[in-house]
A protein has these predicted regions:
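Blade-level signature of beta-propeller repeat domains, shared across WD40, Kelch, NHL, RCC1
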Residues: 246-269
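Conserved beta-strand positions in repeat-built beta-propeller and related beta-rich domains
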Residues: 48-51, 88-94, 101, 132-138, ...
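Short loop/turn segments that connect beta-strands within beta-propeller blades
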Residues: 59-63, 102-106, 146-149, 191-195, ...
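A short beta-strand motif characteristic of beta-propeller blades
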Residues: 23-31, 63-70, 107-114, 150-163, ...
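Short coil/turn segments that connect the beta-strands within blades of beta-propeller domains
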Residues: 43-44, 85-86, 129-130, 175-176, ...
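Bacterial Sec-dependent N-terminal signal peptides
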Residues: 1-26
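Repeated scaffold domains used in trafficking and secretory/extracellular systems
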Residues: 33-39, 75-80, 118-125, 163-171, ...
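Beta-strand-rich domains and repeat architectures in extracellular enzymes and scaffolds
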Residues: 29-52
């Protein structure tokens, strides 16, 4: 079972206070460099794409744990999924191709979605059983494929389910559900057979992650959370030093802030 990719120290008023107090964030370290994007897995490994289009893995001790220099083999990479640290997914939308890397960032295999007549996919996600979810925006179906690209299951045609069809900004497999997020329509949740379960109309979120019974995201300089059981929605202003970021994530109790000169990492007290 894939572990949670996000463990945030967020417990009511405790985090609310910390969101208003910069001293509640302990500076740990900074990784200097010019990076365009990054991801963090559940083992605190950081995956960096620099301005020379190199993907580099830095482990929790700050040591280099892998380098992938062929990141632009299929053009600009659309998405990096590090849900499973042993199986890294690189998705190239322009070529409908998924490159699968091992934990050392060596190529394991390449999946050409076009061979399965899948031509329009905006987002992918590692599934609970180590396969791959995708939303086929041409057939309007949620599909699960294996490492050979074989379709293992698919949902009903969304045109038969929804009056207004969603487009996947992000997919996430967590808590026995698959979450499809459309920035203009909100969250759609499905069971592992592709059956629609629920919709949450939270719009314009970014850097979304789903932890134990909580959905997190960022929007307009704020951290947002939604409790799936209590249905409570909260928002917290980011501290002053987090302003004007290129990207921001809270993973494993740490705040990661990407700016033009590098990534700063803070422990949430």
């Amino acid at each position: 079972m894939i572990k949670a990719i996000l463990i945030v120290f967020l417990s009511g008023c405790c985090f609310a206070a910390s969101a208003q107090n910069d001293s509640s964030f302990l500076f740990l370290k900074k990784i200097n460099g010019s990076f365009t994007s990054f991801e963090v897995d559940n083992l605190d490994n950081i995956y960096l794409i620099n301005t020379t289009n190199q993907l580099k893995k830095i482990n929790a001790n700050g040591d280099s744990a892998g380098v992938f220099n062929d990141i632009k083999r299929f053009g600009p990479v659309t998405q990096i999924d590090v849900t499973n640290p042993l199986k890294i997914l690189l998705y190239y939308k322009n070529f409908s191709t998924i490159v699968v890397l091992d934990r050392f960032l060596n190529i394991r295999n390449t999946i050409n979605l076009r061979r399965q007549n899948i031509f329009a996919v905006n987002s992918i996600a590692t599934s609970y059983d180590n396969n791959i979810w995708l939303y086929d925006e041409q057939e309007y179906k949620l599909k699960k494929i294996d490492d050979d690209g074989t379709v293992l299951l698919e949902s009903n045609d969304f045109r038969q389910v929804f009056d207004s069809i969603p487009s996947a900004t992000q997919l996430t497999d967590r808590n026995n559900f698959v979450y499809l997020y459309d920035t203009a329509k909100g969250f759609y949740s499905f069971d592992y057979y592709g059956s629609f379960k629920n919709r949450l109309p939270f719009l314009h979120w970014a850097n979304i992650a789903v932890a134990e019974k909580i959905i997190y995201g960022f929007s307009y300089g704020k951290l947002l959370s939604y409790q799936l059981q209590s249905l409570n929605q909260k928002e917290y202003s980011l501290p002053a030093f987090a302003k004007n970021y290129m990207a921001v994530k809270i993973m494993n109790g740490k705040l990661y802030i990407l700016k033009p000169d590098g990534i700063s990492i803070y422990q949430v007290k």
